[in-house]
């Protein structure tokens, strides 16, 4: 028979052992994640983005512009993207850089033309966390900040405003949040998509994409897909209210 003091000491000992075991069990996934190595994937892409929306500034007013996919060879001087992801367990760090240089011409009433030269750069930095699935099929919540730069020059040719020209530029930042998905069809084919939306210094900012990849060489995939982005920024007469969308092609490497 144990005395009351002995039984009390045993209960305390068992409680400490149970707490210690529970701590090890709870820490197991975190310790496993800590032991996982970082993996990196990403690469360059060409984006055949058509453009539609309104641009303007105080000296020229706001004007509608449009450039369809069929006009890209004539209007796009440069369009390139770089996308990357660093992943460790359920955590990921996301980057996305985009630059588009366009020169569009739109017909105005009375035979006049509007030429719009636009240089746009955008960069996203954020993070994600896997809430469902595993390495082969997963759904992540993601969030971060997207920074924009836009410089535009509007020039009127012909008509009552012929010769009028004006240039302006702006930089702004928006908070973004959304979902990202990845599905490995088999060892060589995979599908990926994301949807992000937000606002901040702009009125609205969104980004949608769907991609398919084929691993043609260990660690390297050919990627094709479709991406659409929109942003509506207006400040002190400067207007950049544009939707860009079109197919993309690229190479993604995994390290």
Give the ranges of each region predicted by the language model.
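Cleavable N-terminal export/targeting peptides
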Residues: 1-38
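Short glycine/proline- and aromatic-enriched beta-strand/turn motifs that initiate or cap beta-hairpins
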Residues: 32-101, 184, 250, 254
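Residues that define the transmembrane beta-barrel architecture of outer-membrane proteins
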Residues: 36-38, 76-80, 119-123, 137, ...
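Residues on the lipid-exposed face of transmembrane beta-strands in outer-membrane beta-barrel proteins
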Residues: 42-44, 82-88, 125-129, 143-145, ...
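Transmembrane beta-strands of outer-membrane beta-barrel pores
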Residues: 46-50, 88-90, 97-103, 131, ...
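Flexible, solvent-exposed loop segments that connect beta-strands
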Residues: 54-70, 101-118, 149-169, 234-240
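Repeated loop/turn-to-beta-strand initiation elements of outer-membrane beta-barrel proteins
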Residues: 90-93, 134-139, 187-191, 219-222
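Outer-membrane beta-barrel translocator/channel fold
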Residues: 222-255
């Amino acid at each position: 028979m144990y005395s009351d003091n002995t039984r009390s000491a045993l209960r305390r000992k068992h409680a400490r052992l149970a707490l210690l075991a529970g701590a090890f069990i709870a820490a197991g996934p975190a310790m496993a994640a800590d032991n996982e190595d970082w993996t990196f994937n990403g690469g360059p892409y060409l984006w055949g983005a058509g453009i539609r929306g309104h641009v303007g500034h105080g000296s020229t007013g706001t004007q509608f512009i449009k450039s369809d996919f069929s006009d890209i060879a004539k209007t796009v001087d440069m369009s390139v993207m770089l996308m990357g992801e660093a992943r460790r367990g359920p955590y990921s760090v996301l980057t996305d850089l985009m630059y588009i240089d366009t020169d569009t011409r739109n017909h105005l009433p009375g035979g006049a033309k509007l030429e719009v030269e636009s240089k746009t750069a955008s960069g996203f930095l954020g993070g994600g966390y896997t809430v469902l699935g595993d390495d082969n099929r997963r759904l992540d919540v993601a969030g971060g900040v997207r920074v924009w730069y836009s410089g535009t020059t509007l020039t009127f040719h012909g008509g009552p405003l012929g010769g009028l020209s004006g240039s302006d530029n702006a930089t702004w930042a928006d908070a973004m949040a959304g979902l990202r998905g990845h599905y490995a069809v088999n060892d060589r084919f995979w599908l990926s998509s994301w949807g992000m939306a937000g606002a901040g210094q702009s009125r609205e900012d969104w980004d949608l994409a769907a991609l398919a990849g084929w691993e043609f060489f260990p660690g390297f995939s050919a990627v094709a897909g479709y991406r659409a982005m929109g942003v509506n920024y207006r400040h002190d007469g400067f207007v950049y209210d544009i939707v860009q969308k079109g197919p993309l092609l690229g190479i993604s490497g995994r390290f």
